[in-house]
């Protein structure tokens, strides 16, 4: 954001920074993209701008989740028109539906598109989890519902997803601090906050783990683990936007209310980490 408006120059610069690394894809208008405070019009415009900036070099997955099924379907359809290659759909928040309600909710979204859908289970934000049973039922009925972003805080849950869904279903870590434990249990990668800044280290770590070179992956993981934790000292994306500005990648760290700017204490913690890791 810049003076209350979407900072499209910063968005283009951030996408360019990502494309310099060997990333596999971009997520637009997720939590880190401040989707909760975007209007529907802005939501679609940001997706369209991300697709244009990516230039077909990597797929763009658009966040289209909502706690209203009709709204999620509408967002998904509009995101597809805007050029998204797939959709990240978070569990409905606040109204806390039953597991059967979740199945019907995701089913209606799946029936609105043939493009890949990534389910997003994050109980700490939504108050509910997407059960293994619901995930398996959706995958059986709708093969394009083929990926899970798991921010469960539990390696046990990831293990259950991997065991139940098989090798063709992609389970992705949704927590930078748990990337390596999740991948050791069978996750295939990460949808990352830290990689907004640390593109090359994250790509190299994930690739090493996929190659079963856990010694190399662990070295990177342990080096950057304090950063993975520090960027969640305050609500995401406030700390990572500060980090990106300090690194000269974006010009504005501004966020919209009810998010507020970084406290001085967290700035000092991040500044010390930048110096320690050689990021500035």
Protein language model regions, located:
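Catalytic alpha/beta core domains of metabolic enzymes, predominantly
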Residues: 111-112, 125-232
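Glycine-rich phosphate-binding "P-loop"
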Residues: 121-122, 144, 256
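Active-site beta->alpha loop and helix N-cap motifs at the rims of alpha/beta catalytic domains
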Residues: 1-127, 137
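Short glycine-rich loop/turn motifs that provide flexible caps or phosphate-binding loops at active sites
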Residues: 24, 29-32, 62-64, 146, ...
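C-terminal alpha-helical cap/extension of soluble enzyme domains
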Residues: 17, 21-23, 32, 184-187, ...
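A general structural signal for well-ordered alpha-helical segments in protein cores
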Residues: 11, 43, 47, 72, ...
């Amino acid at each position: 954001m810049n003076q209350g408006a979407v900072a499209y120059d910063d968005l283009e610069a951030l996408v360019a920074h990502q494309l310099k690394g060997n990333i596999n894809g971009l997520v637009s208008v997720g939590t880190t993209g401040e989707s909760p405070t975007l209007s529907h019009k802005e939501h679609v415009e940001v997706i369209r701008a991300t697709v244009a900036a990516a230039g077909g070099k990597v797929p763009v997955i658009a966040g289209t989740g909502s706690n209203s099924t009709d709204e999620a379907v509408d967002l998904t359809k509009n995101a597809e028109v805007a050029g998204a290659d797939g959709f990240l759909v978070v569990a409905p928040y606040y109204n806390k539906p039953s597991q059967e309600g979740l199945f019907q909710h995701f089913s209606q979204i799946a029936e609105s598109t043939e493009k890949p859908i990534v389910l997003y289970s994050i109980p700490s934000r939504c108050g509910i989890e997407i059960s293994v049973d619901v995930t398996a039922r959706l995958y059986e009925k709708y093969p394009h519902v083929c990926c899970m972003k798991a921010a469960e805080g539990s390696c046990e849950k990831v293990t259950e997803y991997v065991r139940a869904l098989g090798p063709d279903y992609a389970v992705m870590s949704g927590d930078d601090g748990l990337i390596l434990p999740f991948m050791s249990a069978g996750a295939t990668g990460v949808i990352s906050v830290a990689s907004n800044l640390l593109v090359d280290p994250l790509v190299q770590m994930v690739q090493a783990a996929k190659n079963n070179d856990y010694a190399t992956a662990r070295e990177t993981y342990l080096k950057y683990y304090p950063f993975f934790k520090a960027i969640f000292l305050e609500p995401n994306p406030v700390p990572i936007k500060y980090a990106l500005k300090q690194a000269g990648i974006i010009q504005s760290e501004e966020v919209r209310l009810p998010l507020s700017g970084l406290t001085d204490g967290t700035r000092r913690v991040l500044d010390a980490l930048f110096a320690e890791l050689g990021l500035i």
